[in-house]
Amino acid sequence: MLKFVVLIFVVIMASTFAEQCGDKVCGEGTCCSEFPVVHCRELGIVDDLCMSPGETTDSGRYLFFCPCETGLRCDKNDWTCKQDSSRSE
């Protein structure tokens, strides 16, 4: 029972301290993520878990993870950010 109470406390604290997001509230370099609570999350860097751009819910938020930073792509084989090898340099 104590573990459950601690878990609830942590979730409430996380939702209190996380920047709540909605229409255009998240700043540059972030996206709005719905899980575990609706909050702004940083865009993915190399090897972070990611969602592809445009894979949002009906509310326009990303379900679990943000897309990758500019210059990276979300590899659908393992859902992580990788260097975009299609860029011409």
From Swiss-Prot:
<dbReference type="GO" id="GO:0005576">
    <property type="term" value="C:extracellular region"/>
</dbReference>
<feature type="disulfide bond">
    <location>
        <begin position="31"/>
        <end position="66"/>
    </location>
</feature>
<keyword id="KW-0732">Signal</keyword>
<feature type="disulfide bond">
    <location>
        <begin position="21"/>
        <end position="32"/>
    </location>
</feature>
<feature type="signal peptide">
    <location>
        <begin position="1"/>
        <end position="18"/>
    </location>
</feature>
<keyword id="KW-0964">Secreted</keyword>
<feature type="disulfide bond">
    <location>
        <begin position="50"/>
        <end position="74"/>
    </location>
</feature>
<comment type="similarity">
    <text>Belongs to the MIT-like AcTx family.</text>
</comment>
<feature type="propeptide">
    <location>
        <begin position="87"/>
        <end position="89"/>
    </location>
</feature>
<feature type="disulfide bond">
    <location>
        <begin position="68"/>
        <end position="81"/>
    </location>
</feature>
<feature type="disulfide bond">
    <location>
        <begin position="26"/>
        <end position="40"/>
    </location>
</feature>
<dbReference type="Pfam" id="PF17556">
    <property type="entry name" value="MIT_LIKE_ACTX"/>
</dbReference>
<protein>
    <recommendedName>
        <fullName>U1-hexatoxin-Iw1e</fullName>
    </recommendedName>
</protein>
<dbReference type="InterPro" id="IPR020202">
    <property type="entry name" value="Atracotoxin"/>
</dbReference>
<keyword id="KW-1015">Disulfide bond</keyword>
